[in-house]
Amino acid sequence: GQDIGDPITTNTPWTGGIVDKSWFTAPGQAKYRAPGNVKVPFWLQPETYYKGAAWYQRDIVLPESWRDQRVVLFLERAHWETRVWLNDRFIGSNDSLSTPHEYQLGVDLPPGKHRLTVRVDNRMVVDIGENSHSISDHTQGNWNGIVGRIELRATPKAWIDDLRVYPDVAGRTFRVEGVIANAQPDGKLQTGRMALALQRWHAADQTRISPPVKRLAFPVALGTEKATFGWSIPSGDLAGLETWDEFNPVVYQLTASLPNGSSRTVTFGLRAFGVEGTQFTINGRPTFLRGTLECAIFPKTGHTPTDLESWRKVFEAARAHGLNNLRFHSHCPPEAAFQVADELGMYLHVECGTWPNQSTTLGDGKPVDDWLERETDRILKAYGNHPSFVILLHGNEPGGDRHVAFLKKWVERCLANDPRRLYSGGAG
């Protein structure tokens, strides 16, 4: 840490429940409760503890080449809520625990100096369950800040906002769907052609295997605020595509490009994960998940890593023990974890960051209900193309008299929105 906050005492307002009162009452533990000699036995103890808002401010300089471009602030992983201002103008807020926080700073910003302000708040802005590994002090810790990539990006005013690939394993092909957004729509229906380039992707060294498998082009509309598109690629155009599984983790990259230079690239694999009777199946064949928990336990840093090598170490250790599956207990990993899992053929069970049973409940109209719906959509948009992403749950051990009905509808909505994986109402 940075020695910010208050010294640790018996009254430190930890995030997470404590079920053993002996440290607070037992005579034999008295010396470890004394001021200046506090030793917390439940989890790794920071030197100081801070829960609240932290403010970050700096001047940024936009180059002349960004004139008339859409400028975006990208924060890969924040904990927890961020709020952003540019030149004292409030831009917005974001409360995702699982996905990048992205802010459109403007579409007509003049080149030159601007003042950027970011506020990060690690208090429980929504009660999603005090013991959730996404927020609690039990494992990674209730840290405050931003990790991973912190970037300013410039794009054309019309850009590809979403790109999804739906594999058809039986037909050895796929369907492409997405959204084109326009920051300054003129109301006129403009048409253009979107180019698609498909390539094998060598995940281990992050390189494309040339030449492209296929290049295709399709008509699109550009003049409206939001324009959706979708095409099923004829199987005859995609001869030789291989399926993805733990034994043959073949990964492809699809790049979609607009005439104005905007492009978006996604990684995917040709795979189908399902159920037959009481068994999981991969590409129509029965499989067995040999797994373990990953509970956001990273004691050296106190937060989930965002680099490839850290996750390669985690997954290779699992594979060395004969495992092919990790359950991310009440949290969701960042992009790097999915990339490495794609590469190594690991099956990931991801959760939306909740453990709603001690301090809150599901299905009772509490703020966690709405937050879960929004976080689900954000996770599916950010990571849904990865073939390793085979299972999604809301979180751990749901509580509340109405949680069964609520989660039944949640599963149904998820399947309707994105049928590329399995969904369930909970795990224990």
Question: What are these model-derived regions, one by one?
Answer:
Residues 1-328, 340, 345, 375, ...:
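Secreted/periplasmic carbohydrate-active enzymes, especially glycoside hydrolases
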Residues 325-428:
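Substrate-binding/catalytic cleft of secreted carbohydrate-active enzymes
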